């Protein structure tokens, strides 16, 4: 008997996504580089919507200190990386410069709350991650980042994330399960 998507989500303790929510989400976090002095921490944003988002004045109010420049946009389906040190990130992971912003002030911890706000101060997304289970443990000191399994999942839940590979660059979204299907 094949396992249906709903059964798979239930086994993982993840709520089934009803539909892809439009908007910009915190999609990937690299918070514990190996070695610790590498200065290649980053937060990746993904635009899940069908229109270009103008990020001018948007900012992180928790975790890191970074405000997006007035002319910053993110196309539908696009990605942006906010890096601790853009030059070091680019050298380490061959990340294309046009997708990397920064530097930000602060350091990501082994447990942090990241809050993304628009220019009016409204909360757009929030992730309160940790370095232990149910969060991906390979992201804690092993050099990996953690990435959202599907952009419509609640990214404030550890079960919605997985450890990423070592090549870190904006690419096709990680979609392990299609949204909008029922079992």
Q: Where do the PLM segments sit?
A:
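Positively charged n-region of N-terminal signal peptides that target proteins for export
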Residues: 1-6
